[in-house]
């Protein structure tokens, strides 16, 4: 863990929220379409609109209760979609988490999550539709897409659902990444970075996310990637 922190802090900046927000705002000026995967109640999209982005967007949220709240917000120039995103088309069962469902995932909680947030529990399962991102973007005509992925350990399955044509059109990613296994069978940060570097993207900024400060352990970070 110390080695990984050493590498990260010397290749990209680990910075407070307002600085990542400033970087995101600059990147959005070069984008003509925003895809919000794991939109929850629309919190992140609200931030994007507050940045001054007025272009087209889609918010994607799988859980029905959260989707109803999301749809009621009625963001300007934004469509909504009630489904999960992953490397298959069909249906899956999703674990619904307590506290407004922000930790809900297709994957099971792992020990680090249970220790870091003992008040978060799964309270049921919900059958949801799942679609590849390539299918969602199959009629896309935009050439500078910003994709945000917050899928609680399922991020790599979303990335694998993107085809070559989509990658040509995607300018930036913002991804929640795990430094340790907070969800069972989740992909860790080093593999996400390696994969996206191989697709022609580089990390621009890293922001601290979920952690256990009393133990000195960071669990998750948000990473902003841009095309080289």
Predicted regions and their residues:
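Phosphate/nucleotide-binding beta-alpha loop and adjacent structural elements of enzyme active sites
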Residues: 1-228
């Amino acid at each position: 863990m110390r080695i990984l922190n050493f590498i990260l802090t010397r290749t990209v900046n680990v910075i407070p929220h307002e600085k990542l927000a400033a970087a995101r705002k600059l990147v959005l000026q070069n984008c003509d379409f925003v895809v919000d995967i794991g939109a929850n109640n629309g919190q992140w999209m609200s931030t994007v609109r507050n940045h001054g982005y007025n272009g087209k967007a889609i918010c994607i949220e799988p859980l029905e209760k959260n989707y109803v709240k999301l749809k009621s917000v009625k963001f300007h120039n934004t469509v909504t979609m009630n489904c999960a995103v992953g490397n298959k088309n069909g249906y899956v069962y999703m674990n619904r988490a307590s506290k407004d469902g922000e930790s809900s995932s297709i994957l099971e909680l792992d020990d680090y999550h249970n220790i870091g947030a003992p008040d978060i529990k799964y309270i049921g399962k919900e059958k949801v539709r799942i679609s590849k991102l390539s299918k969602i973007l199959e009629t896309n005509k935009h050439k500078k897409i910003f994709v945000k992925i917050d899928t609680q350990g399922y991020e790599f399955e979303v990335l694998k659902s993107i085809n070559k044509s989509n990658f040509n059109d995607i300018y930036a990613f913002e991804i929640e990444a795990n430094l340790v296994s907070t969800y069972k069978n989740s992909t860790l940060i080093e593999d996400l970075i390696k994969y996206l570097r191989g697709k022609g993207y580089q990390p621009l900024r890293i922001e601290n996310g979920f952690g256990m400060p009393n133990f000195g352990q960071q669990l998750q970070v948000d990473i902003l990637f841009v095309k080289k």
